[in-house]
Structures are given as structure tokens and as C-alpha cells.
Amino acid sequence: MQRNGVVECSVCRSRLVVPSPRSVSRAYDKHRSKISSKFRALNVLLVVGDCILVGLQPILVFMSKVDGKFQFSPISVNFLTEVTKVVFAIVMLIIQSRKQKVGEKPLLARSTFIQAARNNALLAVPALLYAINNYLKFIMQLYFNPSTVKMLSNLKVLVIAVLLKFIMKRRFSVIQWEALALLLIGISINQLRTVPAGNTAFGLPVTAIAYIYTLIFVTVPSLASVYNEYALKSQYDTSIYLQNLFLYGYGAIFNFLGILGTALFQGPESFNILRGHSRATMFLICNNAAQGILSSFFFKYADTILKKYSSTVATIFTGLASAAFLGHTLTINFLLGISVVFISMHQFFSPLAKAKDDKPAELLELEDTQNHRSSESSFVNMTAGAAEDASHRIGTDERQPLLPT
């Protein structure tokens, strides 16, 4: 049980402070170096699945347009996507609860649900940011072709790296920062002369509107991803399906509020969430739901950087598929940009590029623990379990509660 930043052992009632963002990041790095072959296979499956789903998404959006416009409300697609993910989370929770062992706290118990809801209340923040980002995905399709949208989304990697450094205290080596710079260069090469000049929208040049949407399109989901990763890993003991239920539930609420707002401005007829939908939009909803579910596994069991680099690989699939099925031309800029992107990926994930701490990981963990205990000494001394805290032996499972087994 967690109270006031302190975790209480359910067996001996001793207390330990909650790990800091830096210790969460270091725990993941330590685990990654000792990762099993089975978990590596899981990562490969996650990356492959993410490449396929992310690559298909802009193509399905393009196929959903009629005469270059959407006949349906993008907010309705986002709402139906969140509802689909909520249903999936409920089904998986029921399946997981039936496989629980005797003596384990039931997942579907009211007390478990209420406590988990309190501990994961911060998931409402990334849910709101995701709701905004999902709407922007459709807006971006009005200004760029599918492969260009994917290349623009890769800008999130640099923003995410900066956010990880300041929010989760992740360390990146100079080589890794250079790899991110190469990624930006590759994207810039692909973006040369992609926006036609002379067109206007909302009274402003298309380029200006596109740049504004691009800035929001890159910043909002990056902040949501990092915040989501921290929220999921900080409550690692909570079932991922229960956490997803809260995240998707918040998302459904925010998108439904968006539908209500649209109905107030455009009239009651716009409240029909199924108006203008086709078979392509149904595939789009399923694809978006699968992306969201897969992303939660990335954030909890891997990290956001791996998720975004796997999305970068999807750029090739998107470019080739859009050329084959939609008639788009693969320019030399696109091919050169993709080459630089892959060089960046190889450099970033190279073993020689990994950042190393000046001190051993065990010593740094000991220092973090001592600093936390010093700051919380007054609280610990006031509790009846202070003596037990000094004698309680911490096992491997308790020392690293944020890592998958």
C-alpha cells in the first residue's frame, strides 16, 4: 500500500520510500542489460506489430476521405476507438481474474478497483493529450500525404528524449544525441519542397497553418507518451489491463465531450456518431484501437524511445504502400531521408552508444535509498514499524518492483 510517497510491506508492515524517476529509469536500464531471449522476442513482436499498424494508419485515413474531405466526424472515430479499447480491457480483465491463484486479491473487487483508480488518477492527463492528438492526425492528412505525415511524426523522438531527460532523468550519451540529430536531418531531407506554395486556408498560407499544426502534433503526443510511461511504471503492481481501462475510459469521456461540443456548434444532426462512416473507417477504428493497446505494452515493459523508433521503421512501409496503392511517387529525397534515419537507428541502439554512469549502478541505488530515507526519517520515526524497517530484509522481487519478471 502506498501512502505519502511511502510503500508499506503487506507482510511485515515495514516502510520504504517510492522510487524516484531516476531510479525508475536506472532500473529499466539495468534490466535491459540482463534481458532474456524470451523478452527480446516479445520486443521484436511488439516492434513488428507496431510497424504494421502505424504504417497502415495514414493509408486508412487517406482511403476514408471522399473528394479530399472527411464525410464523418474525426472525433466520432476517436470516441469509437476508445470504446473499442475499453471493451478489450474489460474482456482481458475478466480473463485475467479467472486465472488468479487462491489467496490473491481479486482484480474485479470493488476495493481493488477504487484503490487502483485513486493511484492511477494521473492517467487522465495523457488521456486528454491523446484525445487532442488523435484529432490532429486527421487534420495533418489535409496538408501532407501519408508518408510525409509519418516522417513528421518522427520529430517526436527528439522531443521525447528531452522530456525523458528532464521528467524521468534518463541519461543519453553524446553518440545518442548525435543519432537523434541525424534523425532530424533525415526528416529534413524528405521534407524539401513537399508543401505547395500559393494555397490558402483559414486566410493564412498553407505553410504557416501546416507548421502550427506540426508543432502541436509533435509536442502534445510526446508529452502524453512520456507522462503515460511514467504513470504506468510508477504503478507497476497494478494490472496493465486495469490501468488501460482507466486510460481508455478517460479518453472516451474526453472524446464524448468533444462530440457534445461539436453538436452545440453544428447542430443536433452532428451528434450522430455513425454518420458518414464506411468500411474503411471501421478498419481505421480497429487499427487505431490496436495501436493504443500495443503502445501501453511498450510504455510499461519497454520505453518510449523504442516505441518511436519502431514507428520510424513504419515509414518505409507507409511510403512503399502509398506508392503501390495510392499512386504517390517515391522521390530521391524520401529514399535519402530513409537511409539517414536507419543510420541514426543503428547508431542510437549500438552498445557503444549507451550512456554509462560515473558510479556503479548498485552504489547509485544505495545513495538514492539513503537520500530518500534521510528526507523521510521524521515520518518513519513516528511510525510503529520503524524498528521493523531497519531489520526487514529486502528481496530481489521487492527491490525491483518496476521491472517485468
Swiss-Prot record:
What's one Pfam family here?
A: Nuc_sug_transp
List, as start-end ranges, the regions of compositional bias called Basic and acidic residues.
Answer: 389-405
Give the protein's function.
Sugar transporter involved in the transport of CMP-sialic acid from the cytoplasm into the Golgi. May transport important nucleotide sugars such as CMP-Kdo (2-keto-3-deoxy-D-manno-octulosonic acid) in physiological conditions.
Signal peptide limits: none
UniProt keyword annotation of Transmembrane present: yes
> Which UniProt keywords are given for this protein, alphabetically ordered?
Golgi apparatus, Membrane, Sugar transport, Transmembrane, Transmembrane helix, Transport
The entry assigns this protein to a family as follows:
Belongs to the nucleotide-sugar transporter family. CMP-Sialate:CMP antiporter (TC 2.A.7.12) subfamily.
Where in the chain are disulfide-linked cysteines found? none
Hey, which stretches end up on the Cytoplasmic side?
1-43, 96-121, 169-171, 222-244, 303-322
InterPro entries according to UniProt: Nuc_sug_transpt
Topological relation to the membrane, as annotated:
Multi-pass membrane protein
Q: What is this protein called?
A: CMP-sialic acid transporter 5
Q: Which compartments is it annotated to reside in?
A: Golgi apparatus membrane
Q: Which residues lie on this side of the membrane: Lumenal?
A: 65-74, 143-147, 193-200, 266-281, 344-405
Report the record's Gene Ontology biological process terms: transmembrane transport
**Start and end residues of each stretch annotated as Disordered:** 368-405
